[in-house]
Each structure stands twice: as C-alpha cells, then as structure tokens.
Amino acid sequence: MSMPATSTKTTKLATSLIDEYALLGWRAMLTEVNLSPKPGLVDRINCGAHKDMALEDFHRSALAIQGWLPRFIEFGACSAEMAPEAVLHGLRPIGMACEGDMFRATAGVNTHKGSIFSLGLLCAAIGRLLQLNQPVTPTTVCSTAASFCRGLTDRELRTNNSQLTAGQRLYQQLGLTGARGEAEAGYPLVINHALPHYLTLLDQGLDPELALLDTLLLLMAINGDTNVASRGGEGGLRWLQREAQTLLQKGGIRTPADLDYLRQFDRECIERNLSPGGSADLLILTWFLAQI
C-alpha cells in the first residue's frame, strides 16, 4: 500500500542508520515473543491466555511493522523544527497505516497495537534527536517521546462522553492511565526500573533470557497493566502483581530451575484468563533501549 506523506522537508539522515534502528525495533518484538515461558502471554510453549493468536501471528506482525518503523524515524526528523506537541498529530496516520498492515498480516488479530504506539513514538524521538544532532540515549529518547505526548492523558482519558472507550473506563474506575500515561510521563517504569534492572543482571553475568524473564516479572509487579485489568478487573490486576512480587522476593529468575515457578504462574494466568500485554510492550521497549 502507499505510505502516507510525512513532510515536504528533507532529512539528512543516512538510510543505513534509519534501517539500523528499524531492525532493532523488529528484533525487540521478536525477542519478547520468543522469550519463554511467559505468564499468560504467547511464547514458544503455548498461546497463554489467548485463544485467537499464535506465535506465528506475532512473527508476521513484527515483520509487517518493521517496514513502517523507518517512516516514524523519518517523520521525527522532518518535524524536528515543529513544536513537540504538534508531532503526535502527524504520527497518527503513519500509525494507522502500520496498524492496517499488521491486521492484514495476522488476518485481523491484534498482536502489536501497543507496540506500534510505543515503538512509533521512540522511533520518531530518535529521528528528531538525530536531526538536531543531539545525543540518542534511553533518557533523551524517552523524554523526547514524552514531549510529543504532552496533554494526551487529559485529552483522551479524562474526556466525558456517553460512549466510553475501554481506556477511559479503566481510567475512571481504577485511575489507570495505561500506555498513554506511561508515554506522557517518559516511560518511568522502563527508565527508572526495568532498564537498570535488566542491565544490572546482564552485568552480573546472568543469562540474557533469564534476565529478561526476571525483568518481565518486575514489570508485572509494578505496572498498572490495563490489559490485565480489562480481563480481570482490579482483583485480577492486584492478584497478578502480588504473584509477581512474591516470585521476586523469593529470588526471582536466576537459574533454569526457577522456570518451574514461571510455568506454574503461566498455568494460573491461563486459568484466570489474564494476559500482561502492557508489561510485554514495556519489555519490548526495555530491550530496544538497552541496545542504543
């Protein structure tokens, strides 16, 4: 399909550099979905609490999305002289077109809608920073993405109307701001918690997969995951957070033997129909930012 126009301004970014970041985004999505075992989530072992999707759907989806990540980077570069609050409006048509390709690749299954939003924001932030010759670090990328989203929670979650979206309902009932709130705040769960935790475990010599699984547990323990709350309500969310915190307090995932705890957690999540998809999206960002 034809790609939406991004800007009439040209960028000075090398295609090879743009493609390098886009490849990292694709690898981040594949790293997350292939990570196993993950409680309630699709992985190499089972489909978690999802009856409508399989591992291959995520592989096809990630490939479809990879083709659009350069467009987000290019728009971020082309719009570098715009006020940051104006950038999100221009990103939306790119995101919608990317989402359309995702649904075509998966025959209508929503595999990575959250990642299109979050990776799209981070890629646009990278493009802006590169164009302005500013350092590209996890902190600068996330703070730039936050500047794009200024006022987003107020505009989209606090609006009163008769037809509440799922996000608006969870915000009004439980105060959860979900992906919008995390983006507007500059991804503090990633920058302040998941990323330093993951990097510390790697520095200690822990196997990278075990380090990622332990980091997923950390995210599940502290994230007000709207995916979980939409399936299990406040009770389901609090249960999942407590279980993840309990595993962390017992020592977390440090050896292959600890995977038995995750397998049991997975079975319990499936029985309760709970899937921490929001935490999975944040794990994708954690791995992505760890590479830059």
Swiss-Prot record:
Gene Ontology MF annotations: ATP binding; triphosphoribosyl-dephospho-CoA synthase activity
Upregulating conditions: Repressed by H-NS. Part of the citCDEFXG operon.
Pfam families: CitG (PF01874)
Keyword terms of this UniProt record: ATP-binding, Nucleotide-binding, Transferase
ATP-binding is among the record's keywords: yes
Catalyzed reactions per annotation: 3'-dephospho-CoA + ATP = 2'-(5''-triphospho-alpha-D-ribosyl)-3'-dephospho-CoA + adenine
Keyword Amino-acid biosynthesis carried by entry: no
EC number per UniProt: 2.4.2.52
UniProt record, GO biological process: prosthetic group biosynthetic process
Enzyme class label: transferase
Recorded family membership: Belongs to the CitG/MdcB family.
Functional note: Catalyzes the formation of 2-(5''-triphosphoribosyl)-3'-dephosphocoenzyme-A, the precursor of the prosthetic group of the holo-acyl carrier protein (gamma chain) of citrate lyase, from ATP and dephospho-CoA.
HAMAP family reported in the protein's UniProt record: CitG
Protein name stated in the entry: 2-(5''-triphosphoribosyl)-3'-dephosphocoenzyme-A synthase
Originating species: Escherichia coli (strain K12)
